[in-house]
C-alpha cells in the first residue's frame, strides 16, 4: 500500500510491503563544493 510521510523538510513517499517498508524518491543533497569540500 502506498505511504506518504510528511517531514519538516518535505514529503517522503514509500510503500508498505507486508513486513517491510520501501522508500521511493528520497531527495539527495547537493555535493559539497568550494569551501564546503574536503581539502588535502
Swiss-Prot record:
It catalyses: a carboxylic ester + H2O = an alcohol + a carboxylate + H(+). Keywords: Hydrolase, Serine esterase. The keyword Ion transport does not apply. The keyword Hydrolase applies. Disulfide bonds: none annotated. It is an enzyme of class 3 (hydrolase). Its EC number is 3.1.1.1. Belongs to the type-B carboxylesterase/lipase family. This is Esterase-4. It comes from Drosophila mojavensis (Fruit fly).
